């Protein structure tokens, strides 16, 4: 997975209108989303329940954009094949979700998918050092996972900078998720993020504003990181 030529924006469907879900997917696709981010929650690893493989399958039918599936579930391994078969392009598991992170990442790759590892705000960067050779993406949670619309945790940027240094020379993308807006995107991009997950900041205001919101987040991040589309 080569580094992107610009900062990518991945709208999180957790903030979409579930009553018109397919329309929402197609609207953010048309508005310029680079990826579509799906937050899968089990009510156990995180204190919320969202959706499963059948919803991912429905989203796959509605868009050709890459599907970025973030598994906030424990255990994750029994469900990897189902999400891969449903159409995920990239599957991210949490470092905190089980004792056998190598096994989970190897299983994702064996399914022919890109593999990501996520870190909660309180988990140190060093937790992923042993598996860097197995990952295509590192996701730094910038809020505690479970709910949308939370406030960006600025202190996670130091962890992101450490991860970038730790992974120097590797072909790895760095994603941030939580509290991302046009105001917080510059800090994330300056610290090294090249994939920004945004939920409320994209979906509030209705479909007619999705394109403006995506462009504002991407533009603010690119100016901070020195990248220009």
Predicted regions and their residues:
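N-terminal amphipathic alpha-helix/helix-capping segment at the start of soluble metabolic enzymes
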Residues: 1-15, 22-23, 222-229
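C-terminal helical cap(s) of enzyme catalytic domains, especially alpha/beta-barrels
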Residues: 108, 189, 203-229
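Conserved beta-strand positions in the central sheet of alpha/beta enzyme cores
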Residues: 10, 29, 35-37, 68, ...
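Conserved, mostly hydrophobic/aromatic
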Residues: 21, 28, 39, 83, ...
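A short alpha/beta connector and helix-capping loop motif
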Residues: 44-76, 80, 185-201
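Glycine-rich, proline-tolerant flexible connector loops at the mouths of alpha/beta enzymes
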Residues: 35-53, 143-149, 202-204
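Active-site beta-loop-alpha junctions enriched in small/polar residues
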Residues: 12-16, 41-43, 72-76, 96-98, ...
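Conserved anion-binding
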Residues: 17-20, 62, 66, 78-82, ...
């Amino acid at each position: 997975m080569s580094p992107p030529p610009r900062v990518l924006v991945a709208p999180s469907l957790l903030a979409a209108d579930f009553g018109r879900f397919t329309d929402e997917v197609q609207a953010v696709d048309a508005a310029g989303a680079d990826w579509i981010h799906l937050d899968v929650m089990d009510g156990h690893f995180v204190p919320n329940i969202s959706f499963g493989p059948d919803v991912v399958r429905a989203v796959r039918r509605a868009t050709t954009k890459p599907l970025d599936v973030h598994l906030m579930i424990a255990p994750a391994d029994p469900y990897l094949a189902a999400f891969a078969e449903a159409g995920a392009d990239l599957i991210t598991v949490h470092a905190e979700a089980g004792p056998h992170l190598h096994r989970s990442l190897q299983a994702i790759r064996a399914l022919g998918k890109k593999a990501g590892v996520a870190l909660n705000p309180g988990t140190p960067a060093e937790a992923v050092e042993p598996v860097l050779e197995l990952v295509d993406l590192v996701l730094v949670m910038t809020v505690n996972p479970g709910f949308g619309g939370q406030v960006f945790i600025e202190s996670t940027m130091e962890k992101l900078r450490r991860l970038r240094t730790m992974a120097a020379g590797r072909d790895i993308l760095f994603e941030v998720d939580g509290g991302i807006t046009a105001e917080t995107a510059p800090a994330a991009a300056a610290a090294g993020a090249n994939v920004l997950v945004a939920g409320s900041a994209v979906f509030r205001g209705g479909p007619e504003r999705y394109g403006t919101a995506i462009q504002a987040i991407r533009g603010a991040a690119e100016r901070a990181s020195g990248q220009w589309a």
